[in-house]
Regions:
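His/Asp/Glu-rich mid-to-C-terminal helical/loop segments that flank catalytic regions of hydrolases
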Residues: 165-221
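Beta-strand segments within the central parallel beta-sheet cores of soluble alpha/beta enzyme folds
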Residues: 43-52, 77-80, 211-213
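Soluble non-cytosolic domains of exported or imported proteins
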Residues: 18-26, 40, 55-59, 106-111, ...
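Metal-dependent peptidase/peptidase-like ectodomains
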Residues: 51-163
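Sec-exported extracytoplasmic/periplasmic mature domains
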Residues: 33-40, 66-70, 117-125, 155-159, ...
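Alpha-helical metal-binding/catalytic segments enriched in His/Glu/Asp
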Residues: 1-58, 194
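Solvent-exposed, polar/charged alpha-helical surfaces in well-ordered, non-transmembrane soluble domains
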Residues: 25-33, 62, 114, 118, ...
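C-terminal soluble interaction/assembly domains
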Residues: 31, 36-41, 57-61, 65, ...
Length: 221
């Protein structure tokens, strides 16, 4: 695998962020274009948002939740995509060809969690879901993934969320987070799945909250 090779030394100090979060940002764009091209659109409108200032403490999503462009109570689900370009075994323990971490879906809404699973089961080759970061006990340390991406502010506002990511690899927040190390077939598979999930949520009943909000979990960014 090309990801086993160390990138050549570079004299600049720029973190290009191919996986974090070029992968998520471009997946949102691809899903938006795919849904726009559908002859029959989902019954619900789909709002595609690129939040800024995530690394500074989820600034952009906090602003949007306070200043939404649509009534916030009309938002039935927030699907967050942050770092979905890696996830192979050489990237992180427990990784694999079909690996993806799923965070928050069952914690916030059993309805949404079941939809996330059901759509995956319909795929030609289902993804392997990792729910280890969906446990509250995992939120107390550095790997507090639930509180470290933009879905968090929506969850605090009472919007059911599901967050997809493929793990914290050795190139995370490093100059070596380059496009040459992205696992493109894996990345495409996850993006196609999230597109299918977006359509399903757009056509299905509104997911009901479990009655839990993560108000006591501090965002990290």
């Amino acid at each position: 695998s090309i990801r086993k090779l160390h990138p050549k030394p570079r004299i600049d100090s720029i973190n290009n962020g191919a996986d974090d979060d070029g992968s998520g940002s471009m997946a949102v764009l691809e899903i938006a274009e795919a849904i726009m091209a559908m002859p029959v659109k989902p019954k619900r409108s789909t709002l595609f948002i690129w939040h800024t200032g995530e690394e500074g403490g989820l600034v952009g999503s906090a602003y949007f939740v306070k200043n939404p462009t649509v009534p916030l109570d009309s938002v039935v689900t927030q699907l967050n995509i942050d770092m979905i370009g890696r996830g192979r075994a050489e990237d992180l323990p427990g990784g694999g060809d079909d690996y993806v971490g799923v965070v928050g879906s069952f914690f916030d809404s059993k309805d949404l969690g079941e939809t996330v699973k059901a759509v995956n089961a319909k795929q030609a080759k289902p993804l392997t879901f990792d729910y280890k970061f969906d446990e509250p006990i995992a939120w107390a340390n550095y790997n507090n993934i639930y509180g470290r991406s933009d879905h968090f502010n929506y969850a605090r506002a009472g919007v059911p969320i599901a967050f997809f990511f493929t793990g914290l690899h050795g190139d995370y927040h490093q100059r070596s987070d380059e496009a040459e190390f992205i696992d493109y077939p894996h990345y495409q598979k996850i993006t196609n799945y999230i597109k299918a999930l977006t359509v399903e949520v757009g056509n299905g009943p509104r997911p009901q909250l479990n009655g839990t909000k993560p108000a006591k979990v501090k965002p990290i960014g």
